[in-house]
C-alpha cells in the first residue's frame, strides 16, 4: 500500500446512493484521552505511539515529522488529513486503512479524530463504521467523558457527541438558476453549516459545497445523521428539478457551455487550477445530463484529484513555477480525458 500513489480512494472510486448529486459522505468523531492534557498545547509523540498500538496491521501509521511537505499536501488533497494537521501538527500522525475510507488523525486539535468516508449519500454506513472503530478504541483506552456534557473536546462546539457529519455535493443546477443563495440560507436556518471542499476555512467553489451539522450537544449521533440526511434529500430533489428545467428550457445553451468546457480541457496547453475546476464542473454536469456516455463519474473524480497542485508536483518529480504547473495540469487533464 502506497498512499502517495496517484490512485482514487475507495469512496471516490465506487458508486453510491444519489451520486449524481452527492460526491461523498463523512462522519468524524473527536475524542481525547482521559489522563492527557487537551487542548494540545504541547504535542506528545508518546500519545501517537500509545494510540497506534491499539490498531492492527490493517492500518498503516504515517507520522507527520517523517514525511515531506509534498507528501503531507497529497494527504490533504485526498482528504485523509486536514490542512490544520499539515501546517500545525509537528507530532501528529494519521492511521489509514488500505481502502483509504478510514482515516484516524492523531494529535490534531484533539488526540483522536476518527473519520469514515463513503461514496454518495450513505451517512448511516459511515456512522456505523466510525462507531465500530470508536467502540474498539474505547475498550482499550479511557476517553475524557462527562455525564452531563458528553465527550470533551478541544473546541467547545464539538462537545457532546463529538461528531461532525458532512456531505459533499455538486450543485450546478441550483447555481445556474441562481437559487443557491436561498437554499444555503435555508440550510443555515436549520442549524447546518455550508463550506467549501476542504471544510472549515474553505469557501465553496466550482459548484461543490460541503454541508455539515453544527450542533453536537443534546442529540444522539443517529438523530444528527437523520436530520442531515433529510436536509440532503431535499437539496438533491431541488438540484434535480433545476437540472431538468435547464435541460428542457435551455438545452442548446447548456450543451454549448458543457461542450465548450470539454473542448477547452481536451485541447488546452496551459490552464490554471480555477479554470480547470470550473470546466471540470461543467463536464460533470454534462455527464449527469447524459451528454457524455463515454465519461464515467470515476473519471471525473480523477480529473478533480489529479489536477491538484501536490499531485502535479508529484507527476513532475520536482517543484515548479506557476507557468510550469499550468502546463503539467493541462497535460494530465488531456491524458485522463483522452483515455477511454
UniProtKB/Swiss-Prot annotation:
Q: What is this protein called?
A: Protein-arginine kinase
Q: What are the entry keywords?
A: ATP-binding, Kinase, Nucleotide-binding, Transferase
Gene behind this chain?
mcsB
One GO BP annotation is: phosphocreatine biosynthetic process
Q: Where are the transmembrane segments?
A: none
User: Family, per the entry?
Assistant: Belongs to the ATP:guanido phosphotransferase family.
Q: Which domain of life is it from?
A: Bacteria
Free-text function comment from the UniProt entry: Catalyzes the specific phosphorylation of arginine residues in proteins.
Q: PROSITE patterns given for it?
A: PHOSPHAGEN_KINASE_C
Q: Which residues bind ATP?
A: 24-28, 79, 113, 164-168, 195-200
Q: Which GO terms describe its molecular function?
A: ATP binding; creatine kinase activity; kinase activity; protein kinase activity
Residue intervals of the Phosphagen kinase C-terminal domain: 21-242
Which EC number(s) are documented for this chain?
Answer: 2.7.14.1
HAMAP family noted in UniProt: Prot_Arg_kinase (MF_00602)
InterPro entries with a match to the protein in the record:
Arg_Kinase, ATP-guanido_PTrfase, ATP-guanido_PTrfase_cat, Gln_synth/guanido_kin_cat_dom
Q: Which Gene Ontology cellular component terms are annotated?
A: extracellular space
Its catalytic activity? L-arginyl-[protein] + ATP = N(omega)-phospho-L-arginyl-[protein] + ADP + H(+)
Keyword DNA repair in the entry? The reply is no
